[in-house]
Amino acid sequence: MKLLIAYATTEGQTRKISQTVADQLVELGHQVELLDTARKRRDVHVDDFDAFIVAASVHQDRHQNEIEVFVAASLDVLKAKPGLFMSVSLAAAFEEKTADATAYISDFTDRTGWTPDQSLAVAGAVRSEEYDYFQQQILEHIILKDKDELRSDEPQEFTDWAGLANSVKEFLEPLDSK
């Protein structure tokens, strides 16, 4: 099967997640192409793919504009073929924020008009050494509020790699049996 993984990333974790999923799919015998939607490549034709994985991270309660533009431009094809949406956020890392992570997915599907076959809330990462003062304050006083054990100047990954791999396999199972 030929799959396109289209992604948008701000700090690089969604790129890492997309690459990891691509590697997994190749190991399973699939053809995979990665598309960074910020690069606006003209040589990728969505009609050429059998299924899609769309991945984007959440910043300031919204996914990147370029992924929404990609979905809008590809909507007819996306609706006609199997699709998985991966919404990457820190909200997905914390049980008490699950409703927020789910709301990000709902907002995305409402805005774009695309309802994928499966959606995943994927926990992201914190790279506080790259943040400006205001981002640091949001991280400390909102996102990691009451989570002193998680505060660190070192990068922290919250992505559940094994869980992600299992979810991708679940998405593929009905497609592989066709």
Enumerate the predicted regions with their spans.
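Glycine-rich, N-terminal phosphate-binding loop of Rossmann-like dinucleotide-binding domains
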Residues: 56-57
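Conserved beta-strand termini and adjacent loop/short-helix elements that scaffold enzyme active sites
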Residues: 6, 35-37, 122-124
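Short amphipathic alpha-helix with an adjacent loop that forms part of the alpha/beta core around
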Residues: 41-47
